[in-house]
């Protein structure tokens, strides 16, 4: 993938741009049209200091200490202190791509001109992104209100020459990180530390990654599901547009259309049993548009929410320069992100659950009319028997991980922050769930290809044959038992590359052009 050259117009990021940011390094610049609003907001903060007004976050303490007035000579220390004291995360570091996405989201939010932060601070973040220097940010420690304080504090420590960063996979000090980007440590002005820390950008970055994973899984599950229909000699009748039109759910209709797109009438396998006496297929084949359509709807709903959040201002307090006003609110509360992530979790779990059932159908000779466990000479060969057990284990894990996180809340900051979103965990677990579902789909991919080979000399449709050939270039037909795990890994690697997206109809998925 070529490096994305992105000129940022604040508040105008698209989902496709965000997908690219999450997948590869970028060259980022700020559109000149953003500069006046940024400068206007910093001038409001400067007037507050000059006029000795009391404003939260500028010359007061934070959280429960909001009523504590800070002396003028301590204002810069206050901003440095909030960054260092709030960098209290724990656990493994976020992946570089997650940090890059989080930084771009933060730059986008700050550049809208409602945060009272100077242009040179924003430019430092841009320079770090362009130098591929990514702060080391622990994954755990945020409850998603007041924003993602700990993760964003760890991101911000590097601006001070503190903390750690990663460059080309190597962990370096914050001071070394700045040198690589051609920067010097900065002294934060009033409001700037709080502006950097307040916001939903860590949760949103995790959730966006979950969205992109869910989209890729949806595409692969649709392709693998269509392959399984062919391998099991399933009927095409359940994908008839009339069925889905009378129910009326747009995403169900679109899902059925995708199956018709893959299972076109040129399939020799389909023609070979067009006059068979079987009346109905099991639900895992027949109800794919209904189940996958519901998953697609959750993906689309979540995409809409996350696109808005990606372009939002989630700082507090907010600076309204045109009114010379600064207002405390609660845009840092990540409840929309948490609920979107919970819905993505449901979709990811269901995509995997349905795939596991299709694979189980294929290895059951009574249902699929294929050799038991998809291998000849059964008894001597166990075939795909234990691969299905692996799928079942992964599907079961996802059922537990899919439990909604947004229904939980624990009060923090001496009950000043008495309801929180848990958005960071809600979004962070999506990667693990996605890995589980990808593993399930890898097993189905192998199984469906094996089943299709047993239908030779008949061929499927061109797109299904293309999907099978992608796999067969990496994994050969199973004529007898062999070491299975490497083949699952090869199939998994293909799915991770989103190889099936090109086989899907255009404009089906929100971030895939």
Swiss-Prot record:
Post-translational modification here is noted as: Contains an active site 4-methylidene-imidazol-5-one (MIO), which is formed autocatalytically by cyclization and dehydration of residues Ala-Ser-Gly.
Gene Ontology terms describing biological process: L-histidine catabolic process to glutamate and formamide; L-histidine catabolic process to glutamate and formate
Q: What is this protein called?
A: Histidine ammonia-lyase
Pfam families found in the cross-reference section: Lyase_aromatic (PF00221)
- Residues in the signal sequence: none
GO terms (molecular function) for this protein are: histidine ammonia-lyase activity
What is the similarity comment for this entry?
Answer: Belongs to the PAL/histidase family.
Q: Which residues carry this modification: 2,3-didehydroalanine (Ser)?
A: 146
The record lists the catalysed reaction(s) as: L-histidine = trans-urocanate + NH4(+)
Its EC number(s): 4.3.1.3
């Amino acid at each position: 993938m070529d490096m994305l050259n992105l000129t940022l117009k604040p508040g105008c990021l698209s989902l496709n741009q965000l997908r690219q940011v999450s997948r590869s390094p970028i060259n980022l610049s700020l559109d000149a049209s953003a500069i006046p609003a940024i400068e206007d907001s910093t001038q409001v903060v400067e007037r507050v200091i000059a006029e000795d007004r009391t404003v939260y976050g500028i010359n007061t303490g934070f959280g429960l200490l909001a009523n504590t007035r800070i002396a003028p000579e301590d204002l810069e220390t206050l901003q440095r202190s909030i960054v260092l004291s709030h960098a209290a995360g724990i656990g493994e570091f976020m992946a570089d791509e997650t940090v890059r996405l989080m930084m771009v989201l933060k730059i986008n939010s700050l550049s809208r001109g409602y945060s009272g932060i100077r242009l040179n601070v924003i430019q430092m973040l841009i320079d770090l992104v362009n130098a591929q220097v990514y702060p080391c940010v622990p994954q755990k420690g945020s409850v998603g209100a007041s924003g993602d304080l700990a993760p964003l504090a760890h991101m911000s420590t590097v601006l001070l020459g503190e903390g750690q960063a990663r460059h080309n996979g190597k962990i370096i000090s914050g001071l070394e990180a700045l040198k690589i980007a051609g920067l010097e440590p900065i002294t934060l002005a009033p409001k700037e530390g709080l502006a950097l820390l307040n916001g939903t950008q860590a949760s949103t970055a995790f959730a966006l990654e979950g969205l992109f994973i869910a989209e890729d899984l949806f595409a692969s599950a649709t392709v693998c599901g269509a392959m399984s229909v062919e391998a099991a000699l399933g009927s095409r009748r359940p994908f008839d547009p009339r069925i889905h039109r009378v129910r009326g759910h747009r995403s169900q209709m679109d899902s059925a259309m995708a199956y018709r797109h893959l299972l076109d009438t040129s399939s020799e396998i389909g023609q070979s049993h067009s006059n068979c006496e079987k009346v109905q297929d099991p639900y895992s084949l027949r109800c794919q548009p209904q189940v996958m359509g519901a998953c697609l709807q959750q993906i689309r709903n979540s995409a809409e929410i996350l696109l808005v959040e990606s372009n939002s201002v989630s700082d507090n307090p907010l600076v309204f320069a045109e009114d010379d006003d600064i207002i405390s609110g609660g845009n840092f509360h990540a409840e929309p992100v948490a609920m979107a992530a919970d819905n993505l979790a449901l979709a990811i779990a269901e995509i995997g659950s349905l795939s596991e059932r299709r694979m189980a159908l294929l290895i059951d000779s009574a249902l699929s009319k294929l050799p038991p466990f998809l291998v000849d000479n059964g008894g001597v060969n166990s075939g795909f028997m234990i691969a299905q057990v692996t799928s079942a284990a992964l599907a079961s894990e996802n059922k537990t991980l899919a439990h909604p996180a947004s229904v939980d809340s624990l009060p923090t900051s001496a009950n000043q922050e008495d309801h929180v979103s848990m958005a960071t965990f809600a979004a962070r677990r999506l990667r693990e769930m996605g890995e589980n579902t990808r593993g399930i789909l890898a097993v189905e991919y192998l199984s469906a290809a094996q089943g299709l080979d047993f239908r030779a000399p008949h061929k499927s449709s061109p797109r299904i044959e293309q999907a099978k050939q992608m796999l067969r270039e990496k994994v050969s037909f199973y004529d007898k038992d062999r070491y299975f795990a490497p083949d699952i890994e090869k199939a998994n690697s293909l799915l991770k590359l989103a190889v099936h997206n090109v086989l899907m109809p255009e404009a089906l998925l929100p971030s895939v052009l």
